[in-house]
Design a protein with these regions (language model features):
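Extracytoplasmic gating/loop element in the C-terminal half of outer-membrane beta-barrel translocons
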Residues: 98, 351-354, 405-503, 519
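Surface-exposed loop/turn segments flanking beta-strands in extracellular/periplasmic regions
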Residues: 1, 31-62, 153-178, 227-234, ...
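Conserved small/polar residues in nucleotide/adenosyl-binding loops
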Residues: 547-551
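Outer-membrane beta-barrel signature, preferentially recognizing the C-terminal barrel domain
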Residues: 53-74, 164-205, 234-257, 300-307, ...
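Outer-membrane beta-barrel transmembrane domain signature of Gram-negative proteins
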Residues: 1-86, 141, 178, 373-375, ...
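Surface-exposed extracellular loop regions of Gram-negative outer-membrane beta-barrel proteins
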Residues: 1-12, 16, 70-102, 106-121, ...
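Transmembrane beta-strands of outer-membrane beta-barrel pores
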Residues: 23-29, 64, 93-99, 119-121, ...
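Conserved small-residue
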Residues: 34-36, 41, 256-377, 503
């Protein structure tokens, strides 16, 4: 990576000017050659080429060769002007060219501007409130770009194979992948307003921000007809827009009393995500594990909203009697005209039994079909928050960090496996309190044990799998001791600190899974899907920091 910049700084009375122009170039290459082989005469030989004279005895197991490169070129400029430490204006502009896009839309233009007003430096403020507090107002707008795609999404490749022509097989070439040569930058326009407030000579500070961003020209794998040779093409959804808006606040405080010092910081954030427009295309239905449709992206809703059937409790033995009466009147999968349903709706496949999950018949036709699927929730929390604190008394210090989330939901797809009760694997402890009979219904939240029908009825993706993922977590706590300086000077040591630390000490949550913070293969269109990834580890550390004196 290379960066070349030219700076200018000037001060003229109450005016200050800072300017920068620059050029950056970065390139990343990936070159891999991997070979596996068997048949070496000695386990201590680690080189494939070190086979000795009997090369024919070595069996090449597999080989893999990959090579890729990515380049970004940027031109940038920034001007910052301030007057009398009260008013600040900053303008920036940059243009970026990415090799990940085709020549038609390779370059993106990204300007921004920000304004600041330090009200506490105004005479009227100081006359009214004095010098014990500070207040600054901020506002900004900027345009940013996203090129987070593969390296060659704009370049089609050719495939080769045999083609029978007459009595001979000829070599044939065809377009193996379909690409959009005009693919370009995804862009986000964002407005921000905020304030910085300091009280009691800086002992208490409050920061507040409001933001509103609109992303457009969204990068997306657009499904296409397989006749093209590909199932999808990476492209920009030209008229699609997604909005994120929210507020965040942070308060910092410090207490200094003799040998006792205490710093504490707390923050809270609220974000709302909404698909404004999908650019005229239909709803995006996304498939996750076991080829199950679990999410939908739809105009007016958050990205990747949960989608499935609505569970309405557990079917009782009385319900089952009514179902059998109803089912005997089915004609070609439909009820006769004027027929009044007595029991729960009948699924469109497989029989149901007492103890199975009862599904809501959304369209009121007496049958449970794909048309009965509804929006079940989403993975976005009502708010997130964090607390960090730092105590010190003489040479001892205690630091702790806490994080939390309230109102988020998760599709706990582990229930598909951990509630199957087929004897093929471990189960959640809550299955001990499952439904057995109307006289012993258990907790009312776990369906019956079954061997074959359960996966086809009770384990379809539904609100039954949607769990509250709110949590409060101690992310880290550290206790330390700093040895007195006068002791260390005697052994030519500048400073010595011993500490013990624990990461992920505890998590308070009602979520049954390993971790309420989940991610499905990094796919932003499938948020909040828990398929049983490795749990978050708890780490214990003991260490020391030693600073030696200069010679």
């Amino acid at each position: 990576m290379g960066e070349f910049t030219l700076n200018y700084n000037g001060e003229f009375g109450k005016h200050r000017l800072n300017a920068l122009v620059g050029y950056t170039l970065q390139k990343k290459t990936y070159d891999r050659v991997a070979v596996e082989a068997t048949g070496f005469p000695d386990d201590r030989i680690h080189e494939v080429t070190a086979h000795g004279p009997n090369a024919s005895d070595i069996g090449l197991y597999s080989s893999d060769t990959r090579k890729a490169a990515w380049t970004m070129m940027s031109y940038l400029a920034r001007v910052n002007y301030s007057f009398d430490n009260r008013y600040v204006v900053t303008g920036t502009v940059r243009t970026d060219g990415s090799s990940r896009f085709g020549k038609e839309n390779r370059w993106g233009w990204f300007p921004s501007i920000s304004l600041g007003w330090t009200i506490s430096n105004e005479k009227f403020y100081q006359d009214l409130l004095g010098n014990n507090s500070s207040l600054k107002l901020r506002a900004s707008w900027g345009l940013s770009g996203n090129n987070n795609i593969g390296n060659y999404e704009h370049t089609a490749t050719m495939s080769q194979g045999g083609y029978v022509y007459g009595n001979t097989v000829e070599t044939a070439y065809w377009q193996g992948t379909f690409k959009d040569a005009a693919i370009g930058w995804e862009k986000t326009s964002q407005y921000n307003v905020g304030f910085d407030l300091g009280l009691f000579n800086g002992r208490v500070n409050l920061i507040g921000n409001y933001y509103n961003s609109l992303s457009y020209d969204l990068l997306y794998d657009q499904p296409i007809s397989s006749i093209s040779g590909s199932s999808s093409v990476k492209t920009n959804l030209k008229n699609a827009k997604v909005r994120n808006s929210g507020v965040d606040f942070q308060i910092d405080g410090r207490i200094l009393t003799g040998d006792f010092k205490w710093n504490v910081s707390a923050n809270i954030s609220v974000n709302r995500n909404k698909v404004v427009d999908l650019g005229g295309i239909n709803d995006l239905y996304l498939v996750s594990e076991r080829n199950v449709v679990s999410h939908v992206t739809r105009s007016g809703l958050p990205i990747g909203s949960f989608y499935g059937y609505i569970a309405d409790g557990i079917i009782s033995e009385k319900d089952y009697t009514n179902i059998m009466i109803d089912k005997s009147n089915l004609v070609n999968g439909k009820f006769p005209d004027g027929y009044q349903l007595i029991g729960p709706a009948v699924p469109n496949y497989n029989n149901i039994h007492p103890g199975d999950v009862k599904w809501r018949d959304v369209d009121k036709n007496g049958l449970i079909t794909e048309n009965d699927r509804e929006i079940l929730g989403n993975a976005y929390p009502d708010f997130t928050y964090g607390i960090s604190t730092d105590f010190s008394y003489k040479n001892f210090d205690l630091r702790a960090t806490f994080t939390g989330s309230q109102g988020a939901e998760v599709i706990n797809f582990q229930k598909y496996y951990l509630y199957n009760m087929e004897g093929s694997g471990n189960q959640l402890a809550s299955v001990l309190n499952r439904w057995h009979s109307d006289e012993n219904p258990g907790s009312g939240g776990v369906f019956r044990a079954a061997r074959s029908s359960t996966p086809n009825t009770s384990q379809r993706l539904s609100s039954y799998m949607v769990d509250d993922a709110s949590y409060f977590r101690c992310a880290n706590i550290t206790l330390g001791y700093n040895f007195p300086v006068k002791w260390m000077q005697k052994v030519s040591v500048q400073a010595l600190r011993l500490y013990v630390s624990v990461d992920n000490l505890f998590t308070l949550t009602d979520y049954e899974g390993y971790n309420p913070e989940v991610d499905y293969k990094g796919n932003n269109l499938l948020p909040g899907f828990d398929w049983g990834v490795y749990p978050l580890a708890r780490t214990y550390s003991i260490g020391c920091l030693l600073y030696t004196s200069d010679a």
